[in-house]
Structure formats: structure tokens, C-alpha cells
Amino acid sequence: MKVTLPAFEKARVLVVGDVMLDRYWVGPTGRISPEAPVPVVRINQIEDRPGGAANVALNIAALGGKVQLSGLVGQDDTADALTRGVQALGVEPHWLVVEDKPTITKLRVLSRNQQLIRLDFEEAFDKHSSDALLNQAQARLDDVDVVILSDYAKGAVGEPADFIASARAKGVKVLVDPKGSDFARYRGATLLTPNMSEFEAVVGTVTSEADLVDKAQKLLQDLALDALLVTRSEKGMTLITPNAPELHIPTVAREVYDVTGAGDTVISALATALGAGAELPQACAIANTAAGVVVGKLGTSTVSRIELIEALKSHQGESGIGVVSEDQLVYALEQAKLRGERVVMTNGCFDILHAGHVSYLAQAKALGDRLIVAVNDDDSVRRLKGDGRPVNSVDRRMAVLAGLASVDWVVPFSEDTPQRVIARLLPDLLVKGGDYKVEDIAGGAEVIANGGQVKVLGFEDGVSTTAIIQNIMSRH
């Protein structure tokens, strides 16, 4: 997946929601308590990390965005620890202090990288406190481009309909990480990011991909939303927007150690990318990559811009999905175009791959984000080149092409020209090597009629499959 990171420092984001402190007690365990059948943990490390909506804000700051944070806290030492934690990492906190409630704290006891127990210290905040918080946050809308409502059902978000309407009226995008079975509270928001269980709690059990899309489209209409991004664990995530094909983004996680805060990372990366000017499909791809990084960490964590860049390099260094059928490629191209990727296509026999081919394909790939190579099958090559050709079977030719870093997809065709397959795939740019005239290139007219372009590239002089074959024969 080709993803370009925007200038995150341009993003101005306000996070409103349930802030909390994630406290970790860590130590070894080597025996069972004589008082009860439970392990004894000898604590030798205590660590506090901002969690919930505060973790969302920290993720934005880690990516380089400017972030303000509004939340409800108690008048206690935990609130002081939370303040120190967010300020140290560049987040501007705006607390509303509720004197008769504690600051929400999640205490986790860990040993050998395993969580043994979690202890929650919390009391739900009432509607009066929530309304006061949303009114306070509303005064900050002129200073931001994106708002995140981070709802953990602890009372901070409450009934946000008026706040959402005010933000949208000012042109501010409102992203919601929802909670509970009543998404109607978020009516009019720009986008919701439920996980699969949260989504099914609202719409019912999803029985298929088509059913997911149908239910999502109905929810979009019922709640007047611009989009839904359903996060699906090992299946990645699915973006649904009105009157457009769904966009499936596969997971990029290599190893999963801890899913704590993964949803926070998704919505924070999404908001930062949108605030920096990224289009929605690109922003979702960025969020998906960020989530793949954070689940490889233990505990509540953030993802830095450098980590995101390295993850994208690693992921995009793969040579795509290789040899595909036409039907597979049609679907892949729909997804690529939804992501805003520029697709380049070329074709040929590529019987004996040589330096000229490699140079030509690298030039072609440099003109876009994705490169398709359509390859004549064996019968087609034989008709074009004569008996004794091809030297290599179509399967071998395609396997070698798919191994090149410049090539994303390789697809065979059986006709003498690729006109039919080009007309079906309709790339953004069709390229051909040699001294062709644009008007003589097979499939060129169809590409141009679809708004695409056709370009002729030069071949490397003195290098050809025919010359290589003749050279081999002359030596033997």
C-alpha cells in the first residue's frame, strides 16, 4: 500500500473525553501465597502513563500534531500525575475538576510481561459535569481543525449532539471513538471508529462482508454520518462512505503483544492525518499502519512519526501481491484508486529478463505508485515470435517479474495484443517501450477516453532478448 505522510505539524486537534491514568506495578513472581492460591508479586517498578482520551492526545503529540485535551478529573494526586504526564509530552490539558469524584485510574499488576490483574478506581461522572466539560470545549473550536470525542462510557462525553453540531457548523471535523449500544448520541459526526464488537452491538450480528457494508450504509444514513471506519482486529479495517465502494485495508501488524490502546492509536493517527490535509483513504491507511506498530508494544503506548515512517518503509518494501488473475486485479485496482494511488501499466513478452527490461520497468514505476505488467502467454508469444519461443514458460516469466521491486502486479493475457485487458483495467497511465507512436499503442485509445494518459519510454540501446538468444547460439 503506497502511503505518503502529510506534514503532521500542521494538524490542530482537540481531544474531549474520558481521561484516566494507567498505573503499572511490575515485578517478579516465584511463589504462591500461603493465604490464598494466588501468585505473590514482589513489586520493583511502578510506572504511570496517561490513558483513555489522554493516550489519544499523546499519540497526536508523538506524531507531531498540536493537541489540546479536555477531560474530567478529581481533586487528587492522580490528577496531578496525569497533568505532569501529558504536559511532559507536549499536550495542553484543560481539566474540569469534579471535587467529589476520583480521577479514573486503572491499576495493572504485571509479571514476566503478563498482566495478572487489573484494579479500577472510578466513579461515573454525571450529566451536569459532562455538559460543563462540553461547554468548556466548545470555546476552543475556533483554534482547531479536528475534534476527537474519546468515549469510554465514564460520563465525560455524555450527550454531545449540540457540541457536534457546533463543531460541524464551524467546519471542524468530528471523529468519535464510540462506546455502548446507542450510537444515536453521535448523530451528525464526521466519522465513527467502532471495533467489530461495538459495531455489532448496534446493528446486530454481521453474517458476511456484504452484510457488513449494508448495515454500515444504513447506519450512515440513519445518523447522518460522513463515514464509518470499522476496525476488525486481524482483518484490518473497513472504511464505508455513502455512495462509494467500501475500502478494505488489511492489517500490517507483525507481532501482537498487547492491544491496550490500539483504538486510541487508530483515531489519533486518523485525526492527525486529516488535520494535516490527508484525504480520508490515505488517513485510514496511516491509522492502520500506526495500529500495527502499537500492538507490538506492551501496555498503553504511543507511535512516533519515526516509527510510522519505518513501518511504512518495511510494509511498502514488499513487492505487492505478485501474480494475479484479472478478476483479482480488478478488485485490487478499485482499492488502489480509492486510496488515491496512481496506477501505471505496461505489457510485453519478457521472455528472457535482462538489464534493459529492469531499467524500463523502474522508469515506468517511477511515474506512479503502482505498476501492472501484462504478460503474453506462451501461445501468444509463439504467434508473435515464431517457433522456439518462448524460451521460458509464462509461469516462470511472471514469477521473475513479480520478484522485481518495481513491479506490483503481473497478469497474463492470451490475445496477440493487450487491448482487451487494458480496456478492462483502465490504468491512469499506460506506458510502452520503443519507438511507437501514441496512437498506435494497443489500449491507448481506451485509456485516454477514460481520462488517462499514454507515454512512450525508450529502451536501453544494445540490449534485447533476440540479441541475447543470437549471442548464445553463436557461441554454441
UniProtKB/Swiss-Prot annotation:
GO terms for cellular component: cytosol. Pathway: Nucleotide-sugar biosynthesis; ADP-L-glycero-beta-D-manno-heptose biosynthesis; ADP-L-glycero-beta-D-manno-heptose from D-glycero-beta-D-manno-heptose 7-phosphate: step 1/4; Nucleotide-sugar biosynthesis; ADP-L-glycero-beta-D-manno-heptose biosynthesis; ADP-L-glycero-beta-D-manno-heptose from D-glycero-beta-D-manno-heptose 7-phosphate: step 3/4. GO terms for molecular function: ATP binding; heptose 7-phosphate kinase activity; heptose-1-phosphate adenylyltransferase activity; phosphotransferase activity, alcohol group as acceptor. Residues 1-319 are annotated as: Ribokinase. Keywords: ATP-binding, Carbohydrate metabolism, Kinase, Multifunctional enzyme, Nucleotide-binding, Nucleotidyltransferase, Transferase. ATP binds at residues 195-198. The active site is at residue 264. It catalyses: D-glycero-beta-D-manno-heptose 7-phosphate + ATP = D-glycero-beta-D-manno-heptose 1,7-bisphosphate + ADP + H(+); D-glycero-beta-D-manno-heptose 1-phosphate + ATP + H(+) = ADP-D-glycero-beta-D-manno-heptose + diphosphate. InterPro entries: Bifunc_HldE, Carboh/pur_kinase_PfkB_CS, Cyt_trans-like, PfkB_dom, RfaE_dom_I, RfaE_dom_II, Ribokinase-like, Rossmann-like_a/b/a_fold. Its EC number is 2.7.1.167, 2.7.7.70. Catalyzes the ADP transfer from ATP to D-glycero-beta-D-manno-heptose 1-phosphate, yielding ADP-D-glycero-beta-D-manno-heptose. Homodimer. In the N-terminal section; belongs to the carbohydrate kinase PfkB family. In the C-terminal section; belongs to the cytidylyltransferase family. This is Bifunctional protein HldE.
